[in-house]
């Protein structure tokens, strides 16, 4: 590096034993002007601060080279790793410095290895477009987005140079798109149940999912055909549509006594649109068109039909670390539903619901989970739409949906201990109640429940046995094997 000199020459002269060296140096000129071209990402005044020499000072070529490297480092540290100094010259006659920066604008983006998935369905997951400056952070996020669709076994990126501009080649390897799932579970409330799910996970190569699902058991049946898309064009808006038929056999109780048995049939259509929002989680709006028929099977039970047309605004946050037996994270579910004749239905009501639960583990083995639930219903709420209380996950000592009402207040505290790997012992205290009218609420009416249980994480799902007791002498043994569906 010549530093403050523009040129240097050495001349050796003299006889063999009397040699001399003469140096001729040319001083670098005084800085007259600095021109920077090709900059779109930063303010030029900010980049000029990296050039230590000021107008009127003699140019130091070594320092100038170091300053140019600092400008490149500024680009690279910001993720623009393809930026380069395309031209960096000093006019020794005028003292003008010319700097041209190639920021690394993407020449094009190409996808290979896909036989079924449409190219645009892959590229919409990449936040970088042709002509954008190559940003390593955005590229990495795009690769993760593509992989997260679940359509590909592997996703890799290759960067080539085309006319001094980066060309991106995304290589993918597709999973089979047709998926068949079988499952089964048992619990004391519904006995044995099975589930069959058939999914086309890449419908017409667009990344949309079409799923047919059937749940069949002694006391519950579900038949659902659903369509889901995680992207609307290039936005992050998701939507899903489903048509369904549900049939549930339920018991009716008067206090602790079972007095009847009824069958609840639901058939309808739902359309949901939503997206992920910071802090609010998955926010969605659902339109529901549904017919509900309640038929008496035995004893005393409600009967009738309801035609429901409703809109539901919902926010869900779920960052639990695992299922089952989570050890950290929280689960929040908040929604507000409005049904009325203006929407084409026969029932007019408003329902609001909030469920908040937190998991935290201490000393690796002890997990605490507080939970709070609140529900409110106003208007002509059909029996089938009322809140319920009871069951292994809901309220110890009572059976599933043993109590119903338009107003719900409930809280619980669960303590779980990791006895061995995959073996858990737990206890839980529940407090809560249901009321048909607001004016019926009294603190003295709150019910109390307490229980203990043992759970095992098995290859076929959780196996749990619990015992619970509640107010007024209610006692219940619970047992279940398999994942809930």
What label would you give each PLM region?
Residues 1-101, 116, 120, 126-129, ...:
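Post-signal-peptide, soluble extracytosolic/periplasmic N-terminal scaffold domains
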Residues 440-453:
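A short alpha/beta connector and helix-capping loop motif
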Residues 14-16, 27-29, 92, 115, ...:
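A generic beta-sheet turn/junction motif
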Residues 33, 87, 108, 154-156, ...:
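Extracellular/lumenal ectodomain signal focusing on beta-strand-rich modules
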Residues 179-182, 300-437, 481-484:
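C-terminal outer-membrane beta-barrel translocator/porin domains of Gram-negative envelope proteins
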Residues 41-45, 62, 70, 116-120, ...:
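Gram-negative/organellar outer-membrane beta-barrel architecture
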Residues 27-34, 103-109, 174-182, 232-234:
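Short, charged/polar, Gly/Pro-enriched secondary-structure boundary elements
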């Amino acid at each position: 590096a010549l530093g403050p000199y523009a040129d240097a020459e050495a001349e050796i002269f003299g006889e063999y034993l009397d040699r001399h060296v003469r140096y001729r140096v040319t001083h670098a000129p005084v800085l007259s002007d600095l021109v920077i071209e090709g900059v779109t990402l930063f303010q030029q005044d900010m980049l000029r601060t990296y050039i230590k020499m000021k107008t009127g000072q003699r140019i130091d070529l070594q320092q100038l080279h170091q300053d140019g490297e600092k400008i490149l480092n500024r680009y690279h540290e910001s993720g623009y790793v393809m930026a380069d100094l395309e031209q960096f010259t000093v006019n020794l006659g005028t003292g003008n410095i010319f700097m041209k920066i190639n920021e690394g604008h993407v020449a094009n983006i190409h996808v290979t290895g896909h036989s079924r998935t449409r190219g645009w369905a892959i590229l919409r997951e990449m936040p970088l477009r042709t002509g954008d400056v190559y940003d390593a952070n955005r590229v990495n996020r795009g690769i993760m987005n593509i992989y997260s669709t679940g359509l590909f076994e592997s996703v890799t990126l290759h960067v080539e140079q085309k006319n001094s501009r980066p060309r991106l080649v995304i290589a993918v390897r597709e999973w089979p798109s047709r998926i068949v799932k079988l499952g089964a579970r048992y619990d004391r409330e519904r006995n044995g149940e099975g589930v069959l799910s058939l999914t086309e996970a890449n419908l017409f190569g667009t990344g949309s999912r079409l799923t047919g699902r059937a749940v069949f058991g002694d006391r519950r049946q579900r038949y659902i055909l659903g369509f889901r898309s995680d992207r609307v064009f290039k936005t992050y808006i998701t939507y899903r549509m489903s048509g369904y038929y549900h049939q549930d056999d339920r018991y009716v109780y008067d206090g602790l006594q079972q007095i009847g048995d009824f069958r609840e049939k639901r058939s309808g259509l739902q359309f949901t649109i939503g997206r992920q929002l910071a802090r609010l989680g998955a926010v969605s709006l659902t339109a529901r068109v549904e017919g509900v028929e309640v038929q008496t099977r035995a004893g005393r039970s409600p009967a009738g039909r309801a035609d429901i047309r409703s809109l539901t605004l919902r926010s869900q946050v779920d960052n639990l670390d695992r299922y089952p037996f989570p050890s950290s994270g929280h689960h929040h579910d908040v929604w507000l539903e409005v049904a009325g004749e203006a929407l084409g239905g026969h029932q007019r009501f408003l329902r609001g619901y909030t469920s908040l639960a937190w998991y935290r583990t201490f000393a690796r083995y002890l997990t605490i989970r507080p939970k709070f639930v609140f529900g409110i219903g106003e208007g002509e709420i059909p029996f089938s739409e009322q809140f319920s209380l009871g069951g292994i996950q809901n309220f110890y000592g009572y059976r599933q949906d043993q109590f119903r009402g338009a107003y719900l207040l409930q809280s619980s505290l669960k303590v779980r201990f990791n006895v061995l790997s995959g073996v858990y012992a737990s206890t839980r205290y529940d407090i809560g109640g249901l009321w048909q009218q607001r004016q019926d609420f009294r603190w003295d009416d709150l019910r109390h429940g307490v229980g203990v249980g043992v759970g095992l994480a098995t290859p076929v799902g959780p196996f749990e046995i619990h015992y619970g007791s509640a107010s007024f002498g209610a006692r219940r043994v619970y047992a279940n094997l398999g994942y809930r569906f």
